[in-house]
Structures are given as C-alpha cells and as structure tokens.
C-alpha cells in the first residue's frame, strides 16, 4: 500500500482529547494534526518521538493532516492510524499473499452479519468453499522482550466481535481473527489477559469453536506499507 504522497515529519509534543496531536515541524512551527486512534496507544505516543503525517485533499477538513507513523527512541516504526490495518489486509488478500486465504474469489468489506448487528471487516466467498468472515485488529502494544499484545485496553467492541465470530464458526462457516502487527519491534503476539480478562476468555471459547487466528506483520516507511511476514501467536 503506497501513500498518495510521501509523508511529512515532525516531533510529537502531545496527544490529547484522543483524536488531536500537537507536533513541531522542521521549521520550528507547531501544528495540530488528527489522530485516527481512540486506543490507549501505550508506547506509541511519547513526546519527542518522530511522527509522520499525511495530508488530505479534502479542503473541508478542520485538521487536514493525519498522523500515520511514529518512530520510537529504540528506532521502532509503528503505524498508529488504525484505518490502515484493514487496507493492508485487503491488499494482501487480493495479491494472494496470505497463504491461508488464497482460494477465495470474491472479497467484500463492511458486510452486515451476526445476531448482534455487526459489520465484518472482510467477507470472502468462492464456489465449493464456506463463506469466510474476517475481523481485523491492529497490534501495537510491545513489552521489552519483543512480545506484542492485544488489546491495549479493555475493548467491549472487540468482545462483541469475538462472540459474533464464535457464532459464525459454530454454524459451520469460516471465521478468522486477523492480527495485523503494525509495530516493527514485535516478534510474537499473545492476548493481554492482564488488561482484558474477558477478551481472553472469549477468545479461548472462540478458538475451541473453530475460529482461526492469523498473525501477520507489516513493514512501514514514509512511502509505503506492506504485510510481509507471519508471526507466531499464542493465547
């Protein structure tokens, strides 16, 4: 996935009100940019980090710049724009880069499904195969050992998605929880039961019901992002 134009850079001053971020530009001026991430962003938003941002062509936006990447003091690159996770996975599936999903012919996004009135991130179908429902989650929480975790805060929405995926699997269709790892320092992924015990319990039930967990990492730069490797996952 290539950005429309090469990202510009600045230095993070602060993130506040969840969706706003102040940065200092190379000319020492300051600018407020949009942060499309409502999560905790633990370790991703430290003052002094280098940030990269895109510029929207929509002239009606109050904040036309969007925070895309962050570079930590350990030189790890993180994508903080959660919208990119779905785009990356869709591109990888279309390009036949996800081995487990290469046999599907048709792809749709944001399809309504489930008893709790949800929308699935990605829906795949093909003749002679069960329909495939894919929920995408971005992983950016890292500890000092290279272990990545999801979620980074309690997620009632994520719990709902697990219940929906479990129901899909129990009905004989293919249900996939896809972790898109958007932190270059993460080497493996597990569930943060110390943060959200209910999510952990629901995922155990989901796996027992037949939900598949996939975990792939992206490489990121100011010009493009691309899913490149599969990472180990343990519950």
UniProtKB/Swiss-Prot annotation:
GO terms for molecular function: DNA binding. Gene3D superfamilies: 2.40.50.580, 3.40.1350.60. The gene is sfsA. Belongs to the SfsA family. NCBIfam families: sfsA. HAMAP family: SfsA. Pfam families: SfsA, SfsA_N. It comes from Aliivibrio salmonicida (strain LFI1238). This is Sugar fermentation stimulation protein homolog.
